[in-house]
């Protein structure tokens, strides 16, 4: 089968690999129908994910059809259309039992697919712990509608959930890339008083204004002053940092009011500075870390009910044979791209 593979730092390549086989009774083999490219794939390419293993098939955003299951799998069966969770987790360790599946202690737990084991930018993928890592797609939901459930939408849902948003809050979201928009969709479910999105890319700002006209937008240069003027207590009650740029972490805590919550969703290429003397007295609560993909069944239900719609994010579609072109487009943010669907 064809599989897009991490060769070395800076180099991915479409290569021929054997079709995966069941390796454990809790595995499933999924025929990938649709995959996508995530900014985390670019972090692997650039060498920013030290645990990524050269030689693995990349990709952790995908949907498909179950082809084969191990003897211990009971949640799904061959023929089921499924989303694939970016997190593989055992469901049995301390962290899994407490809902922190990103920190699963099993060797195949956490972010394994497309990082430490073969992922889904390929024709087939083996999914460990299939009962936890696969979710059936409701009959009325298309593959394109479900494509982001296992990763960027799960990230946005997790981030909005832990941010303790209320209907009285002013919420600032920094970054309107794919994860930022998915975070926005999930924040909107909380119905805060106002939502401000900080973004510098004109195409993304235009996308926000077109699809979410009640959301305020502002550039990074004007963000601090704008948030202070358009909030009730001199800053945002909740800030979600989804950009991961060199200056956005500082911007996040600067825009937060005293005693606010700052949720760091972004993955950074470089170390960030936490200048405690500068922020002394703000009494901020920081929440950080990777997505805990416990809510995929819930987000699929919300999609089926029409309460979440991520399909507008799919701006381009490529076949697997042209995945290098898809990466070139996505990495360089050409042609107004938000997300690329890859037909496998």
Each language-model region and where it sits:
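Short, flexible surface segments
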Residues: 75-78, 167, 258
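Glycine-rich beta-strand-centered segment in the early N-terminal region that forms part
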Residues: 20-35, 48-97, 138-141
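C-terminal hydrophobic helical "lid"/dimerization subdomain
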Residues: 1, 200, 225-226, 250-254, ...
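Short, well-ordered coil/turn residues at beta-beta hairpins
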Residues: 34, 85, 240-242, 344
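Conserved acidic E/D residue at the C-terminus of a beta-strand in Rossmann-like folds
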Residues: 199, 266, 290
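Mid-domain Rossmann-like dinucleotide-binding core that forms the NAD(H)/NADP(H) cofactor-binding site
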Residues: 136-221
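Glycine-rich cofactor phosphate-binding loops and adjacent beta1-alpha1 units
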Residues: 163-165, 188, 205-285
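NAD(P)H dinucleotide-binding glycine-rich loop of Rossmann-like/cofactor-binding domains
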Residues: 92-174
